[in-house]
Amino acid sequence: MGSIDEVKKESAGETLGRLLKGEIKDEELKKLIKFQFEKRLQWGYKSSHQEQLSFNLDFIKSLKKMEMSGEIETMNKETYELPSEFLEAVFGKTVKQSMCYFTHESATIDEAEEAAHELYCERAQIKDGQTVLDIGCGQGGLVLYIAQKYKNCHVTGLTNSKAQVNYLLKQAEKLGLTNVDAILADVTQYESDKTYDRLLMIEAIEHMKNLQLFMKKLSTWMTKESLLFVDHVCHKTFAHFFEAVDEDDWYSGFIFPPGCATILAANSLLYFQDDVSVVDHWVVNGMHMARSVDIWRKALDKNMEAAKEILLPGLGGSHETVNGVVTHIRTFCMGGYEQFSMNNGDEWMVAQLLFKKK
């Protein structure tokens, strides 16, 4: 019996109310989340290949009519603007908030973070002496990794979060790195005549909408010899916005505010080659992501009291608000596990593509 048969009918508001009051135990929460993803699969899979192709192409065409990005400011406030001490208590040593890559069963989160950084460098063909731009760099773990490994590279991180810029520059100073820069900007608004040998975008393109315009913008920062490496979460067959699939979907809007996240199909970016052309294309099994978020949740649970104390001052001393933030993060992690472990990691996964300028 699947989750769809096991979940009792209640409104999205009722489910969220119980969740925020702490009335839903983890086992029930797993079933409730899995139910939502099973509904998403029913929504996304079509009965014939022609129907599937038409459905997918309609989505691609719809993106081309939209603004370049989604509601990034809303998402930043609700998802990414957390104290660095909190992030350090939950994530690994490079504070990587995206898929980690587990090369063996006993790999630690620190080893998996490093392996992911190494995989990016290998597939992006990073070489010493290059100029590198990491777009949506987060806390700067990849920037610092490249700057340390390739001493003659000049590595720049771009983010619209002041806290992330400050964290990155502080870590670079601690490490004695002089080949690191940070740009505080919204990538969709940022203009520059500068070009880079390598552009990297790790799990950030999900927050874009009009990918035709966005890829054109990225191409202006490339020369004929440059390469663009994009890593994004995806579904293997169809794309979808991370928004409610029906009126009873409590999960999607709770995890990301509406308009903030687009889950592409594994091949979606192949339809946006007006200004760049694909050089290589890979997928990474979803179990790497599932294992990552599961480790983050366990670290949060282990450090729960300390984590709440870290959050309290920045949230107005409100224990209720702190509990809400923690519930959101735990639910995000549990949801990520259910999503990316479906079909043994062969349903939702991570796509990686390498492009050159046309």
From Swiss-Prot:
S-adenosyl-L-methionine binds at residues 98, 136, 160, 164, 186-187, 202. The keyword Transferase applies. Optimum pH is 7.5. Induction: Up-regulated by fungal elicitor. It is found in: Cytoplasm. It catalyses: (S)-canadine + S-adenosyl-L-methionine = (S)-cis-N-methylcanadine + S-adenosyl-L-homocysteine; (S)-stylopine + S-adenosyl-L-methionine = (S)-cis-N-methylstylopine + S-adenosyl-L-homocysteine; (S)-tetrahydropalmatine + S-adenosyl-L-methionine = (S)-cis-N-methyltetrahydropalmatine + S-adenosyl-L-homocysteine. It is an enzyme of class 2 (transferase). Pathway: Alkaloid biosynthesis. Keywords: Cytoplasm, Methyltransferase, S-adenosyl-L-methionine, Transferase. Its EC number is 2.1.1.122. One of its GO terms (biological process) is methylation. Inhibited by nickel, cobalt, calcium and magnesium. The active site is at 333. Belongs to the CFA/CMAS family. PANTHER family: PTHR43832, S-ADENOSYL-L-METHIONINE-DEPENDENT METHYLTRANSFERASES SUPERFAMILY PROTEIN. This is (S)-tetrahydroprotoberberine N-methyltransferase.
